[in-house]
A protein has these predicted regions:
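A composition-driven surface/loop motif
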Residues: 1-161
């Protein structure tokens, strides 16, 4: 299934450990640094599924190192405005995700079966996307413009607070 969270406080708030085996989780928000898009106290193990979680950077977390699904955890140098589009692709141009946030954000976590260890990914911002916007995602759309803001590799994850 699919879960869409539009959060003013913590997005996914678990007072313990998390295991995700499938499905899609999209978190839009929070914007205040005392909350996180993903907030858990134990471990977060991801063995299936897809996550896009955009929110504040103050308490940002991502799935942990024991996950078989890899993650990219981005922290932007400046807050991105509501409506900003972020596009992530391989150096060879294979799309990982094109995402449009409904709220301002400074951190973005993407967890996807498409991500692999040892691969460098290009991150673009300030762009446009065409096609159907499905809960912030453009699964069959086209991306254009924008500026490459950084390159990154998969993260080892964060383990609870």
């Amino acid at each position: 299934g699919t879960i869409l969270v539009s959060a003013n406080g913590d997005g996914l708030d678990i007072n313990g450990s998390v295991t995700m085996t499938g499905g899609t989780l999209i978190v839009q928000g929070p914007t205040a640094n005392n909350n996180g898009a993903l907030d858990y106290d134990g471990t977060f193990t991801m063995t299936g599924g897809f996550i896009v979680a955009a929110g504040s950077a103050g308490m940002a977390q991502s799935p942990g190192a024991s996950s078989t699904i890899k993650s990219i955890a981005l922290r932007f140098s400046a807050v991105q405005p509501a409506g900003a589009i972020v596009h992530i692709q391989t150096a060879g141009g294979e799309e990982i995700v094109t995402f449009k946030s409904e709220k301002s954000f400074q951190s973005l976590v993407v967890s996807s079966p498409k991500l692999q260890s040892g691969v460098t990914y290009d991150v673009y911002t300030g762009s446009t996307a065409t096609g159907a916007n499905q809960m912030g995602l453009y699964p069959a759309g086209a991306y254009s413009g924008g500026t490459k803001s950084t390159t990154t590799t998969v993260s080892t994850g964060a383990t609870g607070r």
